[in-house]
Amino acid sequence: MKKTYRVKCEKDFQAIFKDGKSTANRKFVIYHLNRGQDHFRVGISVGKKIGNAVTRNAVKRKIRHVIMALGYQLKSEDFVVIARKGVESLEYQELQQNLHHVLKLAQLLEKGFESEEKH
């Protein structure tokens, strides 16, 4: 993922948490904030409750892959994806469906793409 598509610094994370809206399902929480940029930016947070570093990094890679696959469908907002406990045991397909579901709930998918549940 290119640097321009990442939320990295602490003040950006805090601004999204403070001023943004949140949406959640059983496996993910998403905070999002529209800042008027021309493309989306994403931050991924996987806490220590999920597992050791190897497990957390594997979960982050899967999330990153799903986000980049949906890239052209996502609205131009900053958002933070927080993984909840239990996400580490999901297969890729289940993780993809859960993440797609919470993005749809947060209305972060462009119009016309919401009906594409199954890939």
Curated annotation (Swiss-Prot):
Q: What class of enzyme is it?
A: hydrolase
Q: Give the source's domain of life in one word.
A: Bacteria
Describe the protein's quaternary organization and the partners it interacts with. Answer: Consists of a catalytic RNA component (M1 or rnpB) and a protein subunit.
- Family per record: Belongs to the RnpA family.
Gene Ontology BP terms: tRNA 5'-leader removal
Q: What is its EC number?
A: 3.1.26.5
Q: Which Gene3D superfamilies match?
A: 3.30.230.10
The record, for PROSITE patterns, names: RIBONUCLEASE_P (PS00648)
What's this chain's function?
RNaseP catalyzes the removal of the 5'-leader sequence from pre-tRNA to produce the mature 5'-terminus. It can also cleave other RNA substrates such as 4.5S RNA. The protein component plays an auxiliary but essential role in vivo by binding to the 5'-leader sequence and broadening the substrate specificity of the ribozyme.
Q: Which HAMAP family match?
A: RNase_P
Q: Which GO terms describe its molecular function?
A: 3'-tRNA processing endoribonuclease activity; ribonuclease P activity; tRNA binding
Q: Which Gene Ontology cellular-component terms appear in the entry?
A: ribonuclease P complex
Kindly state which reaction or reactions the protein catalyses: Endonucleolytic cleavage of RNA, removing 5'-extranucleotides from tRNA precursor
Q: Which UniProt keywords apply?
A: Endonuclease, Hydrolase, Nuclease, RNA-binding, tRNA processing
Its protein name is Ribonuclease P protein component
